[in-house]
Every structure is written in C-alpha cells, then in structure tokens.
C-alpha cells in the first residue's frame, strides 16, 4: 500500500501501478499492430498521397514512437523500479507529451484540411498542397518537442525510500510545480489543447453548416454521409481521449501548487489523474480509426486488397477445378480404353 501525503491530506494511490501496467500492455499490443499496419498501407499500398495522408503518416509515426517506450513503462509499473537510467527516463517522459500533443495538433490539421476542402474547395487549392502540409508538420514537431523539452530538464530518476529501487514518472516536489511545471502546464494547455479544441469544434461546425446549405443538397447523399461519419468519429475520439486528461491536468496542477487544499478535492483529482491519463494514452489505438474514416484512398486500397485476395482465391479454385475436371476425363478415357482392350 502506498499512502501519499500532499501537505496535510493523506490518500492511497497504489491502484495506479496495476492500472498503468494493464492499460499500457493493452495499448502496446493494439497500438503497435494498428500503427504498423497503417504505416505499411501509407508507404507500400497507397499509390497516391495527398496532404491529408501527410498528416496521417506523421500522426502514425508519433504514435509508434510512443508505443516503443511502453515496455519500459510496463516494466517500471510492474516492478516499481526503473533500472534503465536517467536518460531513458527523460526520453520516455518527453515522448509521452510529444505524442499526446502531437496527436492533438495533427488531428487538428486533418480537421482544418477537411474544413478548407469542403467549405472553400476552390480558394484553398493553393494552400492544400503536399509541400505546405510538410511545412505544417515540421512546425507541429518543433512545437511539441519545444513544449515537451522543459519537462525533461526537471524530470530525473531518484531513490525510493530506504530501498535501492529507482523511481521515474513519480511526483515532482511542490516547489518544482510552483516554479516550473505550472508555467509549462499553462503553455501546453493553451497551445496544445484549448486552441486545437476550438479549431476542431469550429471547423466541424462550419463543415456541417456547409453540408446543410441548399447549394450543397445536390451532392451525393453517400458522400455527405461519409463526411458526417468522419466528423462524428473524429470529434468523439478527440473529446474522449484528450478532454478528460487535460481538464484534470489543470485541476491537478492547482492541487500540486496547493491552490486547492480541500482534502476531498485533492483525493478526487489525484485519483482521476491516472485514470484520465490511461484514457489519453489509448489514442494510439483509436487514431487508425480516424485514418480509415478520413481517407477514401485507404478505404479503396483495403477494399482492393480484399478483392484481389478473393479474386486470386477464385482464380485458384477455377484452375484447381479445371485440373480436377481434366484428370477425371483422362481417368475415364483410360478406363474405357482398358475395358475395350480387355474385351478384345
């Protein structure tokens, strides 16, 4: 049992070790498979790549980089010891924030790109290019790495109590929260969450408004249904994965800086923190769903793959059937010849 003292409030948070171990194991398996398949499709299957594909490739790479660090986290939360050194601890922490806010920003890029394509299809042609998409992706990487870097400087391994085990990902001192981390939280919440949230909701609303205009009613009903599904899936995944954690992170920083001192509030916030963090980490498994609903090219490629497999199976069965038919006729002919020779 682990009891933590936050000023004068005592609470138990030992459940987080089991929770993290189980959740990270599941995310590692599902995230590794789904994102490897996604990158394979992007690189080896897709013949035509557009600006949306560029954003999705970068999102998949971000997810995969984080997934590769999960075995170290799983080992730590299972054994409660970090034997991998201070540098790997820092890298793991940095990749966590890089992945989370990189995912948020890349999903926002996809949302803005869809908004421009549907609301301003002609005016946005000069903006929606692969070259500009690569520039935007470079800007996103620089932003999330720059925003995550300060956390690396304050994160380090330390000994736990009287035993020889090393700790990583554990609580920072209140002094560190008051001097550094509270400012980092303000920056990443504004740049990495609230602005993207506003952009996602605004862009999705504008797209829905455009689709309901009389001018667009003549569009194919199937295409409009696809866009509506795309928006619905996109917003559900965004809100489910990122809203709980980022709202709780604000409250958590207020608790750690002792702005909130009520013990019931402190216990509730610190209990919800590992739960919302696990939900946020699950975005690695849900992002491939966004790829499928966002890109017609991916859907068509998967359908073509399935069709080619079925067609090859059909051709094989045809050839195999023809061979059996020929062999049967030959056997019948041989039998007749043998019977005639015997009769003679």
From Swiss-Prot:
A lipid is attached at residue 284 (S-palmitoyl cysteine). GO terms for biological process: blastocyst hatching; G protein-coupled receptor signaling pathway. Glycans are attached at residue 5. Changing residue 248 to Y: In HYPT8; loss of G protein-coupled receptor signaling; no effect on localization to cell membrane; does not affect protein abundance. It is found in: Cell membrane. Changing residue 277 to P: In HYPT8; loss of G protein-coupled receptor signaling; reduced localization to cell membrane; decreased protein abundance; increased protein degradation. Expressed ubiquitously, including in skin and hair follicle cells. Detected in both Henle's and Huxley's layers of the inner root sheath of the hair follicle and in suprabasal layers of the epidermis (at protein level). Expressed at low levels in peripheral blood leukocytes. One of its GO terms (cellular component) is intracellular membrane-bounded organelle. It holds the Pfam family 7tm_1. Keywords: Cell membrane, Disease variant, Disulfide bond, G-protein coupled receptor, Glycoprotein, Hypotrichosis, Lipoprotein, Membrane, Palmitate, Receptor, Transducer, Transmembrane, Transmembrane helix. The chain crosses the membrane at residues 20-46, 56-79, 93-112, 134-154, 182-209, 228-253, 273-292. Residues 1-19, 80-92, 155-181, 254-272 are extracellular. Residues 47-55, 113-133, 210-227, 293-344 are cytoplasmic. GO terms for molecular function: lysophosphatidic acid receptor activity. Disulfide bonds join 89-168. InterPro entries: GPCR_Rhodpsn, GPCR_Rhodpsn_7TM. It is a multi-pass membrane protein. Changing residue 189 to K: In ARWH1 and HYPT8; loss of G protein-coupled receptor signaling; no effect on localization to cell membrane; does not affect protein abundance. Binds to oleoyl-L-alpha-lysophosphatidic acid (LPA). Intracellular cAMP is involved in the receptor activation. Important for the maintenance of hair growth and texture. It is linked to Woolly hair autosomal recessive 1 with or without hypotrichosis: A hair shaft disorder characterized by fine and tightly curled hair. Compared to normal curly hair that is observed in some populations, woolly hair grows slowly and stops growing after a few inches. Under light microscopy, woolly hair shows some structural anomalies, including trichorrhexis nodosa and tapered ends. Some individuals exhibit features of hypotrichosis. Hypotrichosis 8: A condition characterized by the presence of less than the normal amount of hair and abnormal hair follicles and shafts, which are thin and atrophic. The disorder affects the trunk and extremities as well as the scalp, and the eyebrows and eyelashes may also be involved, whereas beard, pubic, and axillary hairs are largely spared. In addition, patients can develop hyperkeratotic follicular papules, erythema, and pruritus in affected areas. In some patients with congenital hypotrichosis, monilethrix-like hairs showing elliptical nodes have been observed. PANTHER family: G-PROTEIN COUPLED RECEPTOR, LYSOPHOSPHATIDIC ACID RECEPTOR 6. Belongs to the G-protein coupled receptor 1 family. This is a nested gene within intron 17 of the retinoblastoma gene. This is Lysophosphatidic acid receptor 6. It comes from Homo sapiens (Human).
